[in-house]
Amino acid sequence: MKNGKLYLKVALGYLLVLLFALMLLTSCSADSGQNEESGRRIIVDQLGRAVELPETIEKVCATHIYGGKMLFAMGQIEKIAFQMQIGADTEAVAVVDEHYGSLPTVLSSPQGTDSPEGLLALGVNLVFTDVSKGEEATEMYQNAGIAAIAVSGETFEEVYETARMMGEVFECPERADEVISFIEDLRNMISSRLAGLPGEERPVVLVCGSGGVYTAATAGMFQHHMVETAGGINAGAQLSGRWANISAEDIILWDPDFIVLGSTFGVDDVDSVLAESALKTVKAVKNKEVHIFPSSLGWWDFPLPQSVLGIIWTAKTIHPDYFEDVDMLEMADRVYEFIYGYTYTELGGVL
């Protein structure tokens, strides 16, 4: 009799466990079915916001240069709503690419492109915004009915995160992997050549912004990582914020081996820096090691997919013996073709 009661208790126990497991399975299946049935897709952007994606992504754009260039790198030119004003490289694409060249421009768009209303008029239902502008700027589009995803690319990890995110948004994860692998292969080429480089052979490099020689790249900027990857030491490594204002005394104190001007659109050029009397004792000026990024088609020192070229060029500039065989025009052709579908040369670029 005791054995019978024991058997009954064990059987009831198993039954309860089985029923509980079935309840869990049913609950999970119901939740999953609801999501599939509603077609809802949620993505967390680089501000940590949960964004519900449109059921069908019709037209897209970006409010800043980085986001726009990433759309090209991810192969989404067919979904871009208008010719974004994001640099000479994409202006060149508009000349050679029939589809992109046929899109509305900022001037031809009836309501412009700098407001949610203007984007809605162009059929945009997804926009990529700049993390640095904060949540309020992004929510402005969200509140107008446009799904808004904030992205940032100040580090390689952030660039890769953006690529994976866009891969999920546009359902092309394989392209995200290609973008990441492409950049990583070039970074590894640089690091393998500089492996074992002694600390004393790492020159101090001052990277200046479009504001001129008295603006410096800080530790929180892409340019800092660019210099470090290229085998240098960022002169502004102790600074914070973005493009910190500096003085002649700061530059004299740092005494950089190289000064790199970030853009041909800046207020200074090589000759004006070499002629700056306040900097005549600085090593880079005395040795005429003042340089400017050579691209005529878009920036190589901003957080952009093609900025891997800026790293290669910087490495070749400050460590010429390690990169003597690297042809920058050939490298530019390769990178631009990967991103835009056209070589640097085909787009009319010169170095």
Language model regions located:
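Short helix-initiation/N-cap motifs at beta->coil->alpha
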Residues: Q46-G48, L103-E117, E154, L239-A248
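Alpha-helical, coiled-coil/dimerization segments enriched in small aliphatic residues
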Residues: A216-R242
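Extracytoplasmic substrate-binding proteins
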Residues: I43, A50, E136-T215, G236-Q238, ...
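A short, structured surface patch at a secondary-structure boundary
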Residues: A62-L120, L126-V131
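Bacterial signal peptide processing site
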Residues: S29-D31
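Short helices/loops that flank or line small-molecule/ion binding pockets
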Residues: T113-G123, A144, I246-D255
